[in-house]
């Protein structure tokens, strides 16, 4: 009867909040829109891969929503960052646009934040297993994640349709990111594939309800 999680992420997308502070953060002084990567549910092993790449790419802005937001983790992220960054809890609207990285140190916003990205990185793939890929894919963007994804059918399916990409280390991450940043067609095609995958998978809830009704 299908997977009701697809219906759920579509519902979440419909209810996603407008987040003025994110819009402000994404404003660029030069009027050139940055390429935004949203790193959702990240762990230290993930951050060690995407933060150095972010440092080398001034055309990028980065939103990090760490899986754990305790003090030590936030401090370790800040210690790695060499570009202007700010925690959401300490952000001021008047200088948000000057920051290159926004650290989301509160829960409950991630599913609404993905809408502002062009690329998503989903954490957990270097630990026990990746977190929710569908929350990002529903917005039609390519989804990158570490090697531990095999327990998750939707991640395997995303890879199969060309909307998801598993990276195994710093080098494979760089190769895929270089492609997405330099080839607008690759970025658009993979994002479209991810979004279509979710759209084409919805309907399970209706199906289940119909079956219950028939019985």
Predicted stretch roles:
Residues 1-215:
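Nucleotide-activated sugar donor-binding and catalytic core shared by glycosyltransferases
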């Amino acid at each position: 009867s299908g997977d009701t999680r697809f219906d759920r992420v579509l519902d979440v997308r419909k209810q996603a909040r407008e987040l003025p502070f994110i819009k402000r953060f994404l404003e660029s002084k030069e009027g050139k829109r940055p390429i935004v990567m949203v790193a959702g549910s990240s762990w230290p092993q993930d951050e060690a891969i995407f933060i150095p790449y972010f440092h080398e790419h001034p055309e990028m802005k980065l939103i990090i929503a760490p899986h754990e937001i305790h003090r030590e983790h936030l401090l370790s992220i800040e210690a790695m960052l060499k570009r202007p960054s700010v925690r959401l809890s300490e952000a001021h609207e008047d200088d948000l646009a000057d920051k290159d990285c926004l650290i989301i140190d509160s829960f409950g916003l991630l599913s609404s934040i993905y809408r502002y990205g062009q690329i998503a990185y989903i954490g957990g793939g270097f630990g026990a297993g990746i977190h929710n890929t569908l929350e990002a894919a529903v917005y039609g963007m390519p989804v990158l994640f570490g090697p531990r994804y095999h327990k998750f059918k939707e991640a395997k399916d995303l890879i199969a349709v060309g909307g998801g990409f598993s990276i195994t280390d710093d080098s494979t991450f760089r190769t895929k990111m270089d492609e997405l940043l330099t080839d607008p067609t690759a970025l658009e095609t993979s994002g479209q594939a991810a979004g279509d995958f979710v759209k084409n998978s919805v309907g399970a809830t209706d199906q289940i309800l119909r079956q219950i009704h028939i019985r």
